[in-house]
């Protein structure tokens, strides 16, 4: 009996504990990312931001959570009630399960699979389904228009993201995220320099993927009265909100893994190796999240035609050209990795 426990049940308990160890801190990070956003934007606009609930306003996310928890969930009369309830759950769950393959430090990853890149691309692509279902199930023209915009926007920028990741795969020769980080430890500086423009394109593309300014067309308040989640209240709205910010942290972690060396120190200096890799990972993700907030505070929203033109007429040709350029340079310099 004891052998059966250690062979079948104990591994499941360990996996469950790992999931809890990732999920609970992530939800806390999402809650306080909203606080950080309001404080940072407040400072940039010469005001104080939240400062009443608790010392320095630190209890504001808890107050917001309690408020949303006790609000009445209102379901529109002519909506598809089952899909209306499922849509925010789908969005929130997909924003969490992408973390299964992200390496936080050397050996610290929930599932170190050989096709981690394909897994995370698939999960990031599926997140649009929650938004489309919400727009259709709400039976509202504003919500439906926001959902259509979101699907068109994500399809447009998913292509560029995929091509950018191909350039990373060409230089690293693996689909395993932990191995991609370790390859960057010994990667020549000129390859890093060659991938830098693709890192910028990738970051702009994930801005569009997460529907953040200047690409927040699916939830444009001035045009669509909040877009796809206009009919949601209470925990439905809260789950969409949590899903959006969890996706922000996830794509920042993806950018860190692909282009910033993940948990590796930023410079190849011996004493920097004494600092735990988890610290460097959190520092890099935090920097990218600050860039998200900085962009929101400073840039206006794109027009829809400008958004589509940037995706199809600028990023798509540029990333295609860069894939050819990177592969040609790697073949010419005999640096193409063996797979």
UniProtKB/Swiss-Prot annotation:
Subcellular localization: Cell membrane
Chief location category: membrane
EC code(s) of this entry: 7.1.1.-
Keyword Transmembrane helix tagged: yes
Catalytic activity: a quinone + NADH + 5 H(+)(in) = a quinol + NAD(+) + 4 H(+)(out)
Stretches that traverse the bilayer: 9-29, 50-70, 82-102, 115-135, 161-181, 187-207, 235-255, 275-295, 311-331
Origin superkingdom: Bacteria
Membrane topology type: Multi-pass membrane protein
Annotated GO MF terms: NADH dehydrogenase activity; oxidoreductase activity, acting on NAD(P)H, quinone or similar compound as acceptor; quinone binding
CC terms in the record's Gene Ontology section: plasma membrane
Keywords (A to Z) from UniProt: Cell membrane, Membrane, NAD, Quinone, Translocase, Transmembrane, Transmembrane helix, Ubiquinone
Function: NDH-1 shuttles electrons from NADH, via FMN and iron-sulfur (Fe-S) centers, to quinones in the respiratory chain. The immediate electron acceptor for the enzyme in this species is believed to be ubiquinone. Couples the redox reaction to proton translocation (for every two electrons transferred, four hydrogen ions are translocated across the cytoplasmic membrane), and thus conserves the redox energy in a proton gradient. This subunit may bind ubiquinone.
Family stated for the protein in its record: Belongs to the complex I subunit 1 family.
Assembly notes: NDH-1 is composed of 14 different subunits. Subunits NuoA, H, J, K, L, M, N constitute the membrane sector of the complex.
Protein name: NADH-quinone oxidoreductase subunit H
Organism: Rickettsia africae (strain ESF-5)
Name of the gene encoding the protein in the UniProt record: nuoH
């Amino acid at each position: 009996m004891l052998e059966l426990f250690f062979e079948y049940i104990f591994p499941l308990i360990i996996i469950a504990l790992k999931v809890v160890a990732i999920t609970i801190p992530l939800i806390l990070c999402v809650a306080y990312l909203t606080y950080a956003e309001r404080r940072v934007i407040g400072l940039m606009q010469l005001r104080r931001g939240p400062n009443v609930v608790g010392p320095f306003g630190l209890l504001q996310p808890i107050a917001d959570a309690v408020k949303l928890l006790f609000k009445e969930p209102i379901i529109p009369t002519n909506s598809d009630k089952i899909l209306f309830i499922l849509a925010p759950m789908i969005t929130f769950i997909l924003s969490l399960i992408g973390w299964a393959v992200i390496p936080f430090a050397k050996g610290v990853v929930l599932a170190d699979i050989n096709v981690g890149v394909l897994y995370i691309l698939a999960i990031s692509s599926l997140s649009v389904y929650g938004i489309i279902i919400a727009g259709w199930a709400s039976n509202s023209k504003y919500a439906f228009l926001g959902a259509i915009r979101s699907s068109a926007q994500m399809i447009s920028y998913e292509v560029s993201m995929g091509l950018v990741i191909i350039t990373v795969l060409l230089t690293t020769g693996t689909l395993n995220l932990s191995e991609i980080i370790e390859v960057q430890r010994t990667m020549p500086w000129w390859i890093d320099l060659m991938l830098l423009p693709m890192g910028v394109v990738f970051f702009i593309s994930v801005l569009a993927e997460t529907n953040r300014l200047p690409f927040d067309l699916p939830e444009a308040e001035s045009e669509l009265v909040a877009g796809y989640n206009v009919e949601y209240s209470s925990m439905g709205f809260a789950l969409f909100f949590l899903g959006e910010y969890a996706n922000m942290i996830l794509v920042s972690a993806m950018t860190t893994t692909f282009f910033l060396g993940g948990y590796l120190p930023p410079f190849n200096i011996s004493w920097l190796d004494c600092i735990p890799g988890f610290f460097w990972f959190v520092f890099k993700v935090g920097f990218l999240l600050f860039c998200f907030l900085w962009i929101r505070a400073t840039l206006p929203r794109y027009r829809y035609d400008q958004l589509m033109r940037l995706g199809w007429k600028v990023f798509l040709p540029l990333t295609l050209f860069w894939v050819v350029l990177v592969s040609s340079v790697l073949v010419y310099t005999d640096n193409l990795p063996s797979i």
